């Protein structure tokens, strides 16, 4: 599997917008979780968000949806030699501290290396991205 994932953050204009980019550089289709690929809002603590310095976890305060076991319908296929980008507004989903602070964010999950097999999951993770945000 030759998959590359990354995050970027735009914390201007009183919002924290996280853009997830996945590139399938391989020869086979991979399955990407719908919640990171297409969902408009979070339904669980999808990102690891921490204050910097100090490594204090920022509490997730967004909605929590109890889900059934995963099925193949929970994944979006990503063709070989293609990329997918999706942006999610996390401003109201995490309890950002008042004032201006610096944070580190990353994403860790799995992709399906065979889009027909749920048990073909392989771990993916992004590098930590540092950003500053002012909570008013």
Where are these regions (language model features)?
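Structural beta-strand segments of beta-rich domains
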Residues: 14-18
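Terminal connector regions
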Residues: 92-136
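Short Pro-Gly-centered flexible turn/kink motifs
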Residues: 76-89
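Asparagine-centered strand-capping/turn motif at beta-strand->loop junctions
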Residues: 20-29
């Amino acid at each position: 599997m030759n998959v590359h994932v990354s995050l970027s953050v735009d914390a201007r204009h009183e919002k924290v917008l996280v853009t997830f980019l996945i590139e399938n550089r391989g020869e086979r289709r991979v399955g990407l979780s719908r919640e990171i690929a297409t969902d408009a809002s979070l339904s669980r603590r999808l990102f690891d968000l921490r204050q910097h310095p100090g490594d204090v976890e920022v509490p997730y305060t967004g909605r929590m949806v109890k889900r059934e076991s995963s099925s193949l319908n929970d994944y979006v296929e990503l063709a070989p030699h293609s990329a997918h980008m999706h942006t999610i507004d996390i401003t109201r989903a995490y309890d950002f501290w008042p004032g201006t602070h610096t944070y580190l964010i990353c994403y860790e999950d799995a992709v399906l290396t065979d889009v027909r097999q749920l048990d073909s999951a392989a771990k993916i993770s992004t590098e930590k991205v540092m950003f500053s945000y002012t909570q008013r």
